[in-house]
Amino acid sequence: GIGSAITIWSAHFADTLLHRPALGGAALLDARLYAHSLGTAVVLTGITMGQQAVALIGAGIVMAQAIAGVVAITVQYRRAIAPRLASLALHYAVALVLLATGALLGFLISWSNAHGRSALADGFYLAHTTTMLLGFVGTTVLGTLTVLWPTMLRTPMEPVAPRWTTRGLPYLVGGTALVAACGLWPPLAGLGTLVYLGGACAVLVPAYRTARRVPPTSFATASATASVAWFVGCVAVLGARMSLADDAAAAREVIHSLRLPLAAGFALQILVAALSYLTPVMLGGGPAATRATNAIMDRFAAYRVTAANACLLLALYPGAPWQVRVVAGALAALVTSYLLAGMILSLRE
């Protein structure tokens, strides 16, 4: 799942940024991955069976592996020789703290429902989903883009990017906290979104400057651009609509309405972009083989990105007939599936 992918992602980039092996190395990372999967399964089992004690144990396992990751990155950071990008690793530690917080809030949703406190459950649901989306996923992705974006474009990073990104981190956390608390007072969602997007601009403005120097023409960079656009747009809509909601239940429906664009437009697309970029790196084989793999992964890049996003927009348009929306969604999935075909073709080269 996305949690396991981000766990691997954050560990890899923390190693890269800090130039020091993580505490516990690969063994601790493997243990954390197993614990995350086990904890998630136990939580779902507990909720399905209506056993709150089982769900709490599962949430505790997820929280424990997240805190273990925080400790590993913190020790790794303290042992680093203060390289220029070391402070960016703090994004991963903060994101893991937010993951642990989100896991606890997720359990509290189940606990509230079990005790007939539906209004309280709605409030915890808002806090859980926004903490996981904006905090855990958003903070990790934005922190990583600072380093990965210029690398994907094969150009130097903007000199101000590390400093701006580090200064933007408190705004990401503060904005997430405000949006998470909107179950108490809906307008907090609008205020929190503004604060959060302000923190995101600390990453996106240097990224935009980099893109002006070297336009994103490969599939990976164009897909990443579209993914970030979906994320920013969804966060803006989320904040605006939740701030106008009558109560927590209405705000919950706002989140439900944005699940597909966030999952397909943001999460899936950023994953596809990362895999498209990393496949030539992982396969290796020398410069000639890497160029050949890049050529395969970038075939019809402009068409694939444009078609996938246009079809997704049409699939989400409520005014279109359902038959059109289904066909558009299927076409978007079909175009996106070229990634798998590209990987197979690359292996045969």
Regions found by a protein language model. Give the residues of each.
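Hydrophobic alpha-helical transmembrane segments of multi-pass integral membrane proteins
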Residues: 1-349
